[in-house]
């Protein structure tokens, strides 16, 4: 089974600090590497995290404020240098096309990799690969900003003891999957009698935004919600003025969405530590963590 986990490569907001780099988040999922919002210095963060940049297959830019995209050009150049053979898919708001091009071609280099652009102009399902799908929703920020949801489908798992007891094997198994009900030796067998549904995982990634319904929709029953929480509640006026959230507001979104786990990120440089973020959010949503650089949050496939 391939590794599944979310690695924090950076968790600061507009200004990096001595201990927090610009944001960048790597989701390794079903054999793919999904990189979200690579800020300045991201390729160096891969070195510190002891992860090869070549795992990246898809790059997501929520919006084109610098702390969410300044690492894009250097990451593409690094992937060229490493001569990756797989295409690099890039997803971003269509209104930011000119900024994407400026970042991609900001320096002189010989591009050899295949970059597949996905400028997104409407909400909904962006792509569906069968084993997972990508959804985008418009957030409430100062510029066009997208939030993301990565979802894998539910799967049917057979219960071996019940399959054996029912005398099922070979082609008749596929017939049961296709029809949902079959007759075997004068017995009616329903799919739900000999199987259970394994709920597919989903992860929501929410960058800069005020609280909004789109966040709740993206994070609905998600296993992980990675959510910006730039400020503490004592600076709620700054959050409102700059179209950001507090830790409390992020927790409220997670609670409304009934997410399983909340990871706070995008911390303002005014805060030296993040303990208060966890404390503030935890009063509303207990299963909460503050992102830490190079920490990985693993999530093996659900057993049920």
Curated annotation (Swiss-Prot):
MF (Gene Ontology): 3'-tRNA processing endoribonuclease activity; zinc ion binding
Keyword vocabulary terms for this entry: Endonuclease, Hydrolase, Metal-binding, Nuclease, tRNA processing, Zinc
Cofactor note: Binds 2 Zn(2+) ions.
Signal peptide start and end residues: none
Reactions the enzyme catalyzes: Endonucleolytic cleavage of RNA, removing extra 3' nucleotides from tRNA precursor, generating 3' termini of tRNAs. A 3'-hydroxy group is left at the tRNA terminus and a 5'-phosphoryl group is left at the trailer molecule
Cofactor(s) needed: Zn(2+)
EC number(s) stated in the UniProt entry for this protein: 3.1.26.11
Record: active site: 67 (proton acceptor)
Coiled-coil residue spans: none
Chain residues that bind Zn(2+) 1: 63, 65, 141, 208
Listed Pfam families: Lactamase_B
Class of the enzyme per the UniProt entry, highest EC level: hydrolase
Residues holding Zn(2+) 2: 67-68, 208, 266
SUBUNIT field: Homodimer.
Family: Belongs to the RNase Z family.
Protein's job: Zinc phosphodiesterase, which displays some tRNA 3'-processing endonuclease activity. Probably involved in tRNA maturation, by removing a 3'-trailer from precursor tRNA.
The protein, known as: Ribonuclease Z
């Amino acid at each position: 089974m391939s590794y599944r986990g979310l690695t924090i490569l950076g968790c600061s907001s507009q200004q990096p600090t001595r201990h927090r780099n610009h944001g960048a988040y790597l989701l390794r999922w079903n054999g793919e590497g999904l990189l979200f919002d690579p800020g300045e210095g991201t390729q160096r963060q891969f070195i510190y995290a002891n992860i090869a940049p070549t795992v990246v297959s898809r790059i997501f830019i929520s919006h084109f404020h610098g702390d969410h995209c300044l690492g894009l050009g250097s990451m593409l150049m690094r992937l060229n240098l490493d001569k990756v053979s797989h295409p690099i898919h890039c997803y971003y708001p269509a209104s930011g096309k000119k900024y994407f091009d400026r970042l991609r071609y900001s320096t002189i280099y010989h591009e050899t990799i295949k970059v597949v652009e996905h400028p997104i102009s409407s909400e909904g399902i962006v792509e569906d690969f069968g084993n997972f799908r990508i959804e985008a929703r418009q957030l409430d920020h100062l510029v066009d900003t997208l939030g993301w949801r990565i979802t894998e489908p539910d799967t049917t798992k057979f219960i071996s003891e019940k399959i054996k007891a029912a005398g099922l094997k070979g082609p008749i198994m596929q017939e049961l999957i296709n029809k949902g009900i079959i007759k075997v030796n004068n017995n009616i067998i329903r799919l739900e009698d000999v199987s259970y549904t394994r709920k597919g995982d989903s992860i929501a990634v929410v960058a800069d935004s005020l609280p909004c319904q789109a966040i709740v929709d993206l994070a609905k029953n998600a296993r992980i919600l990675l959510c910006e929480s730039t400020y503490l509640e004592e600076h709620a006026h700054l959050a409102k003025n700059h179209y950001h959230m507090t830790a409390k507001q992020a927790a409220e979104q997670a609670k409304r969405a009934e997410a399983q786990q909340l990871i706070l990120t995008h911390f303002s440089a005014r805060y030296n530590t993040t303990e208060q973020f966890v404390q503030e959010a935890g009063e509303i949503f207990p299963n909460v963590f503050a992102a830490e650089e190079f920490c990985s949050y693993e999530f093996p496939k659900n057993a049920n």
